[in-house]
């Protein structure tokens, strides 16, 4: 893949000596096709392509953004040289951290051990595939020159960034915040990257939830009203528009968006605390421990913001003019039903975290490992389609497992607002639904729920990527 650029750099090194400045100057003039003393994104893309360098999606933009100190959208000669010199220093640090036995070469076992510390288990065969993609001389080891030439125009600074391609829970927001929280490295915590990633994820979630709010409200209506006339998606949407106009399709969305910030903050804080309890003596957190810590963090976060979940449901099923807003809704619930009403449906909600988060994590990890072992030949970057596919599949399976509990939770939240509806507990509601509507009654409303998954995931990903650029992540 990189034979041309490797030959170019090695030939320059042989002719000009070890001075990297000379090699990089030659490379700059090779990329500066129009000879204006600057290299822009288009020249970088075309030049790297001509030299056989397959860099990741958006890598050229990241390189220009990182090196463009005067923010004119180009890399002049000085900026180009400074960027590569700084990048080479970072690559040297990454190489040294991987070279555990300090023999000046990276071997398959060192690749496996480094990825294992990041929670990725790969086979020896796959570790050798990774090495072969960098190995220019066929020795099945990678020395510093091979490492430098391979990662010369890769904006990733260290091996830990491989895992970042697979961080998905803050990125892919489908409206149900029951996933295991993201992992952040010590470096990300020290540099403040963690809060930028959380902010980007929160913005992505807000836009995604707003974009799919009509389907989310339809799901709630179908869950609460069972087998009434809105069992059909089109019919249900028409009824909502007829009752309250187009704006009614977004009823309850305000609360759904507002609760993202406190829930995300609480989940992140709680996850860090629970991780300390379950981390082994070696300082590592296994998949099982991560699942337990993540589930407990999810339960803690849900407990703290659960009254907002009740408000969202009541607003969604409310009629036009019934509530003037979130605070009016809260006031009326307090006056008529008391404080306990804000925690109706709490038990099935908490019970639903375990199957959702567990299955979502297990399937995502399985798909991730499968892709890395079978398809990650040249890069650990899976690409957008693979990420969206894995995230959608794992979230969908998690929803299937926990949906009956989610439906019972929603009915318990809403039943006091429905005239003549008996106030049943979790067991009573379960028996009533099965007796009246059959087993499939427990999955009432799942069609619009599934229908919103792909657009929600896609919107989340696009907004997240845009926010990352804005925040300089």
Swiss-Prot record:
Q: Where does this protein hold Ca(2+) 1?
A: 32, 34, 36, 38, 43
Give residues annotated as binding Ca(2+) 4. 135, 137, 139, 141, 146
Spans within the Mitochondrial intermembrane topological domain? 1-197, 272-294, 365-387, 465-473
The membrane topology term of the UniProt record is: Multi-pass membrane protein
Q: Start and end of every EF-hand domain?
A: 19-54, 55-88, 86-121, 122-157
Which positions in this protein are listed as binding Ca(2+) 2? 68, 70, 72, 74, 79
Q: Does the keyword Glycosyltransferase apply?
A: no
Residues in the Mitochondrial matrix compartment per record: 216-251, 309-344, 406-444
Main localization (coarse): mitochondrion
Identify the InterPro entries for this entry.
EF-hand-dom_pair, EF_Hand_1_Ca_BS, EF_hand_dom, GDC-like, Mit_carrier, Mitochondrial_sb/sol_carrier, Mt_carrier_dom_sf
List all disulphide bridges recorded for this chain: none
The reaction(s) catalysed by this protein are:
Mg(2+)(out) + phosphate(in) + ATP(out) = Mg(2+)(in) + phosphate(out) + ATP(in); ADP(out) + phosphate(in) + H(+)(out) = ADP(in) + phosphate(out) + H(+)(in); AMP(out) + phosphate(in) = AMP(in) + phosphate(out); phosphate(in) + ATP(out) + 2 H(+)(out) = phosphate(out) + ATP(in) + 2 H(+)(in)
Residue ranges of the region described as Regulatory N-terminal domain = 1-173
One GO BP annotation is: mitochondrial ATP transmembrane transport
Presence of the UniProt keyword Electron transport in the record: no
Activity regulation (record text) = Activated by an increase in cytosolic calcium levels that induce a conformational change of the N-terminal regulatory domain, uncapping the channel and allowing transport. Inhibited by bathophenanthroline, mersalyl, p-hydroxymercuribenzoate, bromcresol purple and tannic acid.
GO terms under cellular component? membrane; mitochondrial inner membrane; mitochondrion
Fetch the Pfam families from UniProt.
EF-hand_7, Mito_carr
Keywords, ordered alphabetically:
Antiport, Calcium, Membrane, Metal-binding, Mitochondrion, Mitochondrion inner membrane, Repeat, Transmembrane, Transmembrane helix, Transport
Q: Which Gene3D superfamilies does the protein's record reference?
A: EF-hand (1.10.238.10), Mitochondrial carrier domain (1.50.40.10)
Q: Membrane-crossing residues?
A: 198-215, 252-271, 295-308, 345-364, 388-405, 445-464
Q: What does it do? A: Electroneutral antiporter that mediates the transport of adenyl nucleotides through the inner mitochondrial membrane. Originally identified as an ATP-magnesium/inorganic phosphate antiporter, it also acts as a broad specificity adenyl nucleotide antiporter. By regulating the mitochondrial matrix adenyl nucleotide pool could adapt to changing cellular energetic demands and indirectly regulate adenyl nucleotide-dependent metabolic pathways.
Oligomeric and partner information: Monomer.
What is said about the domains? The regulatory N-terminal domain/NTD formed of two pairs of fused calcium-binding EF-hands, binds calcium in the mitochondrial intermembrane space and regulates the antiporter activity of the transmembrane domain/TMD. In absence of calcium, the apo form of the N-terminal domain is intrinsically disordered and binds to the transmembrane domain, inhibiting the transporter activity. Binding of calcium leads to a major conformational change and abolishes the interaction with the transmembrane domain and the inhibition of the transporter activity.
Protein family per UniProt: Belongs to the mitochondrial carrier (TC 2.A.29) family.
According to UniProt, the name of this protein is Mitochondrial adenyl nucleotide antiporter SLC25A24
| Source lineage | Eukaryota, Metazoa, Chordata, Craniata, Vertebrata
The gene coding this protein: slc25a24
């Amino acid at each position: 893949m990189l034979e041309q650029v490797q030959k170019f750099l090695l030939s320059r090194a042989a002719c000009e000596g070890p001075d990297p400045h000379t090699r990089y100057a030659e490379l700059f003039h090779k990329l500066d096709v129009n000879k204006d003393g600057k290299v822009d994104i288009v020249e970088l893309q075309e030049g790297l392509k001509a030299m056989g360098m397959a860099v990741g999606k958006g890598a050229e933009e990241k390189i220009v953004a990182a090196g463009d100190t005067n923010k004119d959208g180009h890399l002049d000669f000085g900026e180009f040289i400074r960027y590569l010199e700084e990048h080479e220093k970072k690559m040297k640090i990454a190489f040294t951290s991987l070279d555990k036995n300090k023999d000046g070469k990276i071997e398959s076992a060192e690749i496996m051990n480094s990825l294992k510390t990041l929670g990725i288990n790969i086979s020896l065969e796959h570790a050798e595939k990774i090495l072969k993609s960098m190995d220019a001389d066929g020795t099945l080891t990678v020395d510093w020159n091979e490492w430098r030439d391979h990662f010369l125009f890769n904006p990733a600074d260290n091996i830990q960034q491989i895992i970042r391609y697979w961080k998905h829970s803050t990125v892919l927001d489908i409206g149900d915040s029951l996933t295991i929280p993201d992992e952040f490295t010590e470096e990300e915590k020290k540099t403040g990257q963690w809060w930028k990633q959380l902010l980007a994820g929160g913005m992505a979630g807000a836009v995604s939830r707003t974009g799919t709010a009509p389907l989310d409200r339809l799901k709630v209506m179908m869950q609460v009203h069972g087998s009434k006339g809105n069992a059909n998606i089109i019919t249900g949407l028409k009824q909502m528009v007829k009752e309250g106009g187009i704006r009614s399709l977004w009823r309850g969305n305000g609360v759904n968006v507002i609760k993202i910030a406190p829930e995300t903050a609480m989940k992140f804080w709680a996850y860090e605390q629970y991780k300390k309890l379950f981390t082994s003596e070696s300082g590592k957190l296994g998949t099982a421990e991560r699942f337990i810590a993540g589930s407990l963090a999810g339960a803690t976060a849900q407990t703290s913001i659960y009254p907002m979940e009740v408000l969202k449901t009541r607003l969604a099923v409310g009629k036009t003019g019934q509530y003037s807003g979130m605070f009016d809704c809260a006031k009326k619930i307090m006056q008529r039903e008391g404080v306990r009403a804000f925690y109706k449906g709490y038990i099935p909600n908490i019970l639903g975290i375990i199957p959702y988060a567990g299955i979502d994590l297990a399937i995502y990890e399985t798909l991730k490992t499968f892709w890395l072992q079978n398809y990650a030949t040249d890069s650990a970057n899976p690409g957008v389609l693979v990420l969206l596919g894995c995230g959608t599949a794992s979230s969908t399976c998690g929803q299937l497992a926990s949906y009956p509990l989610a439906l019972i939770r929603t009915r318990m939240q809403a039943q006091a607002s429905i005239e003549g509806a008996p106030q049943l507990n979790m067991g009573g509601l379960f028996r009533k639904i099965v007796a009246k509507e059959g087993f499939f009654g427990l999955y009432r409303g799942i069609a619009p729920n599934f229908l919103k998954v792909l657009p929600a995931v896609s919107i989340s990903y696009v907004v997240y990527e845009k926010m990352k650029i804005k925040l300089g992540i």
